[in-house]
Amino acid sequence: PEGIFRALEMSRIPVSLDPFLPRALDRRWEGEYSGDDLPRLRAASPDGAVISVRVAFTLARGPLGEIRWQAEIEGETDQVCQRCLQPMRWHFRLQPDIALIRPDDRPSALGEDAERLELGADGLLWPAAAVEDEILLALPLAPRHEQCSAGGHREFEPGEGDREAENPFAVLGQLRGKS
């Protein structure tokens, strides 16, 4: 007999799935993606970047009856350090927990700031696209090595422009005193 805890079935990640089917709920999906599977991430990475992503997710019913995509996304990709302009590896670990919304649904019970993913017109979840969205949202705007020797030197030497400028309103004060 099953207890109150239901064992999660584990499966490979499909290309697409209907998250609202009962058989999709409470099942653990696992797999890996490369740059070939994530074209937008490949485009946002330097040429020849090595992209490896490991994903595990479940579809579960939330407290308000909504279907939630709960994922663990871990991986790494090449980036260019914006301080020294040398290649670097960017490691990431993401744990999105997002309500899935049908195209014709607008559940107000979730609240305005609840994170949600509106599914396409077909009503299907495309896991690779959802994973790619999360990685692109987490991608650093200006990636940098943690210990980067660049940036410690001054590009310009102190010069004439660094001296303290005279107050332009001092002349007005002098004129006011004369009247």
Name what the model sees in each region.
Residues 86:
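Short Cys/His-based metal-binding microdomains
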